[in-house]
Amino acid sequence: MKRFNLLLLVLLAAVSCAPKAQYENRAEKILAEINDPNSKYVVVISHRGDWRNYPENSIPAIESIIRMGADMMELDVKMTKDSVLVLMHDRTVDRMTNGKGPVSSYTYDSLKTLRMRRPHNITTDSIRVPSLREALLCCKDRILVNVDHAYPYYKQIVELTEELGVTGQVLMKGKSSVDKVAEDMSKHEKNLLYMPIIDINTPKGQKLFAEYQEKNVVPLAYEVCWQYPAPEVDDCIATVIKTGSKVWVNTLWSTLCGGHGNDDDAAVNAADPAEVYGQYIDMGASMIQTDRPALLLDYLRSIGRHD
């Protein structure tokens, strides 16, 4: 089966040959867990970092989830007027800083004069919008990175990750066709890890998933999203596991993971978070993106599915 830049062969060898492999850094260990179809380890992806305590997509938010023990930082990227990639989810800086206007209207130096906001709209004294370079250096060898809202900047991101030596630690995901992804990746000597997003309740999502099966392409993982329970959900997840990929589930909000009562908020309100997270473990999910990393990590550790 074909794989386009899904993991270094040395990681495959390390997983298959050594019962207790030694890794040079934590990021390498997490990659090996993801690539091992027999691993019971559940990878925790923190959505925009620890945004409940720090500004989202900020360096302190990243440092906090690394201390927690999360495995991957999901971050969002925009480009400044002078072509510097920075961390920002929104098109404008209004919500997250004391400034106004589109990110693209600021030079990087002018953007750095703005102060970031904590939750509840509190402006910090000294936390600034980080560049993608700063964020990747913070994460390097310590945690994996999922770069979101970033496919238009693929070329620039690959050039940056190659310069910093982190290309194999950075994941991008999308809904492009198999052929489109392969064509785009063929333009580069080295590529980021890539994962398709499958909205399995929709005809487009079903078509994309069928395309991967028909072309015999096995990605590192699939992000499977569903708004409501249905036979196609169970069939998709079973096929993903059977073919050797990992299942990524989003518990950020209910429309991504099966409807009302199935998300992070439900886990907080439940008598036991197992009532929510346990159902995804039972389904075979081995990667979970969450807005409640501390809660999810505590649960996974309690059942022996995380360090």
Predicted features along the sequence, with ranges:
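Phosphate-group recognition and catalysis centered on beta-loop-alpha active-site segments
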Residues: C17-D307
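Bacterial Sec-dependent N-terminal signal peptides
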Residues: M1-R26
